[in-house]
Amino acid sequence: MELFPIIPAGGILALLVALYMTSSVLKEDTGPKEMQTIAAAIREGAMAFLNRQYRTIAGLALIVAVLLALLTRQYHTAVAFITGAFASALSGYIGMYVAVNANLRVAAGARNSLNKALTVAFRGGAVTGLAVTALSLLGVTSLFYAFGGATNPTRAPLDIVGFGFGASFVALFAQLSGGIYTKAADVGADLVGKVEAGIPEDDPRNPAVIADLVGDNVGDCAGRGADLFESTAAENIGAMILGIALVPFFGVKGIVFPLVARAAGIIASIIGMFFVRAEENQDPMAALNRGYIVTSILAIIFLYPISRYMLSGPGVNFIYFYGAGIIGIVLSFIFVLITQYYTSYDYRPVKEIARASITGPATNIISGVAVGFESTALPVVFISLAILGAYWLGLKSGLPGGGLYGTAVATMGMLSTAAYILAMDTYGPITDNAGGIVEMSGAPEEVRRRTDRLDASGNTTKALTKGYAIGSAALATFLLFSAYIDEVKIALNIKGNFPVDIGKPEVFVGAFIAAMMVLLFSSTAIRAVGNAAQYVILEVRRQFKEIPGIMEGTAKPEYGACVDIVTRGALKEMVLPGLIVVITPIIVGLVLKAEAAAAFLMVGTITGVIVALFLNNGGGAWDNAKKYIELGNFGGKGSEAHKAGVVGDTVGDPFKDTAGPSLHVLVKLISTITLVLAGLFI
């Protein structure tokens, strides 16, 4: 157990570095009064939404915790659920607080140099990445030992599955409400402001502009933070459950290996973060990529001694497990490249949509849907190769049943860079907000150019991290499916395989319902954006009509009215899709039993991953097709192609920022629900 101290050391170091970076960001110059006033409105709106969101989620979580205690008759599960929910909410709160304070400092820093603004923005994002991964690691570790991990290590992992369920529960509602908020505000601001009134983006005359900027934080910052928090927590717990079978070969090392690997990944991310700096004329994306490459190389290096020490035994060659970990790290790189290909305007798919816009909105939509469907192929091929490759390496290791553990190590490899990836993701809304503050405050053109460059790189990082999130979700849910099968075998005292026969009517029906649920959930999430956006559109139109002088700039819009309308709409609309996901797997498991629940989990994961890829990449491609036209291609701004591009972008908004990211959470939530309630499905 000599490597055990790395676990608390990695978590505590991450929190200390996050504290240092928070202090570093808050010490920066806050700029002129005009910037401070705008930033204060964004901060007030974002924190008010977060407080109301968490109050709503807390009430729902309390009800679920009581039901869990009554159904499972185990206080461990309910305590773990509440702990996971609280830790997930806390990490989101920390990230949001720093993001809404960093945006102003980035805008002010852009008056001096690009590097100053980049450093502040990335450090603001790094706080979220470090807080999320540290709280996930420390939460799982603390519960493992609190529930008897030192004396009964083969039982404790089964008692802490509620932590993953709690994290997933909060993540689903945080991602849903945040996604509904950000896109309802965005659609409302764009359709009335840009299309009807003909004013540019982030124009202070637009009554929905503050709500739009608030939405960037609650969707991309708090939502994605909760998403990756549950990925790391659920993956750790799933791998620990698989590790129970390895105790005869590795002792307790097989169970705690995921925690040590996670801590090493956090340390690699911390080092990589300090390599992010850029010259005035350098592309900010190059600086961010440098840090990512350093993080990935260090993760590969650190994984070697950990694998050698913890996964070696009589007749077992650790090098195969090390190879499986490298597969996971390489897969994360490949996912980034695939996402970039389908969502960047440097490549064919986006240019194809932009060209189709010349003949109107209909051909834009047709082309975007085609690109979205096409974009599912390569990710599925590489996920499949990664799972098969890692499984084969696990089998070659000499460990009986080592194939599944090989896939677990691959998942650990992919998630080893999670802290850095999440820092890149939160960097996106911070730079977006900074650009809005600069635009609304009337800063000089040079400052706007700097924030535009940062914002462009931020849009790229947001798209890339969605690709990473769905790839890690796919691997994590395969791991959790294996953990569910293991738990059922333990409950039934089965020594061999537990076959899932899709030819049985009840098993087929369980699978069928899962595919339907994914599409029904997506429908309700997209409709929720439309419903909430209608309220915003009506309010913006009302203000343009009833408040004279807004368009002339002599009267100030009522920003707070739009913020309040979107907040109430998002919290109301999140309930139905959320309940669909929580209730459906429970009904399937209780009525159709464990084998049908396994089929539900398997098909729900497959359908969820593919639909999420379609929604994320299709929406991202529509967004950048519009941006490509705005650069002066196919007629530029104001042309018929541009109008068609705006329509496509508006359709893609709820795809890529609401339904798509929520599906990442859905596939993990159905896994953790079935894990927690497996005993009731027997």
UniProtKB/Swiss-Prot annotation:
Membership in a protein family: Belongs to the H(+)-translocating pyrophosphatase (TC 3.A.10) family. K(+)-insensitive subfamily.
Binding site for Ca(2+): D623, D649, D653
Protein name as catalogued: K(+)-insensitive pyrophosphate-energized proton pump 2
Membrane topology according to the record: Multi-pass membrane protein
Cofactor(s) this protein requires: Mg(2+)
Catalysis: reaction(s): diphosphate + H2O + H(+)(in) = 2 phosphate + 2 H(+)(out)
Localization per record: Cell membrane
Record InterPro entries: PPase-energised_H-pump
GO annotation, cellular component aspect: plasma membrane
Superkingdom assignment: Bacteria
HAMAP family assigned: PPase_energized_pump (MF_01129)
Site (Important for ion transport): D220, D227, D657, K668
Annotated binding of Mg(2+) 1, by residue: D186, D190
Enzyme Commission code(s) on record: 7.1.3.1
Regions crossing the membrane: 1-21, 56-76, 78-98, 130-150, 160-180, 237-257, 258-278, 291-311, 318-338, 353-373, 375-395, 404-424, 468-488, 506-526, 574-594, 595-615, 662-682
Molecular-function annotations in GO: diphosphate hydrolysis-driven proton transmembrane transporter activity; inorganic diphosphate phosphatase activity; magnesium ion binding
Keyword vocabulary terms for this entry: Calcium, Cell membrane, Hydrogen ion transport, Ion transport, Magnesium, Membrane, Metal-binding, Translocase, Transmembrane, Transmembrane helix, Transport
Binding site for substrate: K183, K656
